[in-house]
Amino acid sequence: MGSQGLATLDTPPNTDSDTNSDVKAGGLSVRRLTLTDFRCYHHQRMDLDARPVVLTGANGAGKTNLLEGLSFLVPGRGLRRARLADMMRRERGEDIDVPPSQVRPWGVAATLGSPDGEVEIGTAYEKAANGNRDKRIVKVDGEVAKSQAVLADHVSVLWLTPLMDRLFVEGPGARRRFLDGLVFGSDPAHAGRVKAYDHALRERMRLLRDGSKDLGWLASLEDTMATRGVAVAAARLDVTRRLGVQLAADTGAFPGAAIEVAGPVESWLGDGPALAAEDRFRAVLAGARGSDAAEGRTTIGPHKSELMVRHLGNGQAAALCSTGEQKALLIALVLGSARMRAQERGCAPMLLLDEIAAHLDSHRLDALFDEIIGLGAQVWMTGTDSSLFKPLAGRAQFFNVAEATVTAVL
């Protein structure tokens, strides 16, 4: 991508004094957002203040694409978990898979305001040469960062999308990813531990399938799984304990909830120190080589742990609750996580709530709006019906999205 790609990261300094005076204490906000060749946007710039943001428009207009761009201000794969190349803007009728020579760089750049001042963040897609993996590049205040992990030092974002509405009824993998996202917001190093564990998990299984006799290499991989796996489980337990305090209170519109993560490794941590849990995990892995090889999978570890959520009002597991109750529980989880981060970091995270008004009655929607305002966070909300957001008149900034063009509603 070279200099062309890096250019998409740069945001002109925000010198408008009237947009710097209203950053709420405790809130992180986007003051300027620029998307370049990202999804449906050729070049889109938005100038904002610290208030919540409401984006309305028809389905397919580009609302969720804006939220996805914002989700790349933090480390990771964004709210859609898409390939980097998939976010390249395509001309009308252009195929998803384009020749490498026709791949266009994309970029997302933002000026962020916080209690600590302003910071310029940019991230872009770099097409790899010579068959290497494509990658994201990141700039902070004009300096190229060594890795995207540095973004966690400056930005905290939580999101809720319609695809997450089935979180409690789908397989446990989605719930583990959701939980790991919450952990990562408090402990950026968690992502590295999960990655190291997953790599060792795959390598061990490859050796077992191949019938490898390299016992030393197997033991080394199992040691990595034990140390990293126990650390992953401990971090998950810590966050669920702290989040449980936030979720215990029933706020009226959104139910109180109990949350825990369960599995053998978590149980071992409850029985004694982490080193003892590591030793036990290491021994179990060594003893299970034959059975794991026969089954073609590793049957124990934090990759099998389960996030369990219970509705405190009716005592039911989230999976047994009605669709409306599950939606309310999910919103309660996200709001509780936002409160926890605000208290612990002294700065409320940004929230990205896609189609949040869908399937919420007026009572819960009004309560959500009040919670958002009380949190002091810049919350980005999308919807097709602008009338649902009327209670936020004067308390939020409104934009219309149509055919990949964003227009302020005055």
Question: Which residues make up each language-model segment?
Answer:
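Conserved NTPase motor "head" modules and their coupling/switch loops across ABC/AAA+ ATPases, GTPases
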Residues: M1-A58, F72, G93-D97, W217-T227, ...
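Hydrophobic "anchor" residues on beta-strands that sit immediately upstream
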Residues: R32, I137, V157, M350-L351
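Conserved lysine of the Walker
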Residues: K63
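Nucleotide-state sensing region of NTPase/ATPase domains
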Residues: P75-A174, D180-H190, R241-A248, A277, ...
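An accessory alpha-helical subdomain
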Residues: M164-A253, A262-V265
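Walker B catalytic acidic pair
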Residues: D354-I356
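H-loop/switch region of ABC-family ATPase nucleotide-binding domains
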Residues: T382-T384
